[in-house]
Amino acid sequence: MQMRPIRTMHALIAIGIAGLIGGSSARAEFKLRYPVIDYREFEIEHNGAVTFDKQKSGKNNNQSYPTEVEVGILPFWTVGIEANVEANPGENLHYQATAVESYLQLTPQGKYWADLAFFTEFEHPANRNSAHSVTFGPLVQKEVPDFFGTDTLHTLNVLFEKEIGHQAEAATPLFVAWQSRLRLHPLFEPGFEFYGAVDDVSHPGKLADQQHRVGPVIAGLYSFSPYGKIKYELGYLAGLTRATEKGAVRWRLEYELPF
């Protein structure tokens, strides 16, 4: 099959999903999404994040624990379902939302300058007084070999969010995530990452009122072939603006099993 029909089909599917589901206030999710599809692979993934700040700042102990199941059903398409448990500062943990996710890989891995995918997520909140939302945008990844003697991997997410329904707000939040890491060893890949959040792209306001974080991260994987593999990520993020907490710890643990 030629690449042009495939790219056309990808675009039509992406437009179709957006048209069907059509999008919650801006919230930072410390999770990087990757554009390369693992075809015929079953994945269980847990992410977690906890923030740190002064006790009465309203930014301390913000917790988020999304867990999801994903399946690579086609060479260019992965679908998943996510359950999110979280707690705002001063609150107890509660079930926040259920989300359905779609990853459409738009370019074959390694064929072009960078690998590209389109991500779409439809979220159904547990609270009936909250609006449904759709999150969408490009995922980009570039591997740079032999950068000063070491291979490096760079990943960028640019995601927009829209609420839908009669309770929806007009704002369009923007979430940006960037990660660069050194591919020293499959078990140990150190790097750094950035997470940014803007409440409304049409009215971004002052930089100090936006949420921006940066910090170190380590990632790696261990293979149990043919019984799958385990991946991990562990990072610390320092807040860069007055609207951001002073620090946050985030982690990711994932088990992948081919079928």
PLM features: what roles do these ranges have?
Residues M1-L32, V36, P258-F259:
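Cleavable N-terminal export/targeting peptides
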